[in-house]
Amino acid sequence: MKRNSRRWIMGALVIGLAVVFLAGPAAAQVKIRFQTWHWGEKPWVTALDAFKDDFNKANPGIEVVRDESRYADKETVYTATSQAKAAADIAHFQHRPIPMFAERGYLLPLDSFIEKEGGQKFLAQYDQAALEVCKYKGKIYCLPDFVNPMGMLINMAHYKEVGLDPTKPPATWDQLVEYAKKLTTGSRYGIGLIGARQEGLFMRLNPFVWGAGGEYLTADGKRSAMDTPEFLEGFKFYVELFTKHKVVPPGVIEQGAQEVRTQLAHEKISMNISVPQAWKIVQAINPNMKVPETLTAVPVPVGPKKKVTAAEYGMRVISASTKNPEAAWKVYKYWYGHDIQLRNFQIAAVLSARLDVKNGPEMQNDKYAKIYSAQAPFAKLEPRIPEWPKIGDAVITAVQEAFSGQKTPEQALKDAHASANRTLSGQ
């Protein structure tokens, strides 16, 4: 009896150990860090949480976990963590740093995964112009998430208060100044601008630089072209909205994209050059504002030389140092699926680069999306070179110096031009 009991105990122990062993993989679940600055931003966080919860429920062996970044210094932090081989498995950036990160070996090429998914047939699902931005030296380092041309939000009630017709928004730079002056009254200002050290500044500055005929680089891409009269004209126009025309709120150097949207949400400004999703963010900032009845979207005013606007291309990348590339790709592919991309538009109003969403009825019939999408043929990007982040940083310094009066626009731009040439020459 004792022997049988002993055998039973030993058998139970073996079975118990087997259960523990078999349960091991669940306990050692693969965690994929999904990094973006939008985890702390409404309404984006709603879409992100829904994605995370849906994926985790459908894939018990993999867990998507939040990894928060900050918009202003995301590139700097990613560089440091990549050098330490501790970067998030999947990270979110706009288009500007992709060549630099690829050149430095921080990003995992996606070509082998794409081939397994069908190669060119798989890639044909996405906006092809945006897809080109993901390519560097013959390899693909990302898929385009969203393609957001810039437009301008205007407060229709403010227009009517000062005798302006919101159905006839400013079409030229001169009209923009005229309207902004009329809209600047009491504690309210005509337009909000970004002066903070963040890449959102370029999406507001660039339409003026390019609209005047300016370019960042010479045609061969080897030298700065910021010493041209055209570049200076656009640069000065942007700066003088604050320094000369006084139609921008105080503290412009501290104002980033979210701060300016907050000004719009609380009716401290009447106009804001913005991304397509800005109206949703404004609604989240001030739920009491009836945004669809208050704000409408219009094109950015046309410059003296050409009609042009900037764009925000959203990209997700997989780190070259991920310890779980197959699991990371599974999460990555899920994010780019039709249902997730459509829900992202429904919640956050970003314009998906996935063609079956972009050309679908919801985006095609949305009043804001229609106006922003119509700006796509006029959208332009900064030079796609590894040196751009450093050149861009010098441009932001110049804008801040000119805004503050520390330097004249001419001197600030001259110094940025010299800095860009040093960068391009490898110094």
Identify the role of each PLM range:
Residues 177-184, 220-252:
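Glycine-centered hinge/linker elements that transmit conformational signals in sensory
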Residues 37, 56, 203-207, 212, ...:
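Extracytoplasmic/periplasmic substrate-binding proteins
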Residues 70, 95-151, 177, 201-204, ...:
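Hinge/lid segment of periplasmic solute-binding proteins
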Residues 33, 50-129, 135, 160-165, ...:
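Extracytoplasmic "Venus flytrap"/periplasmic binding protein-like
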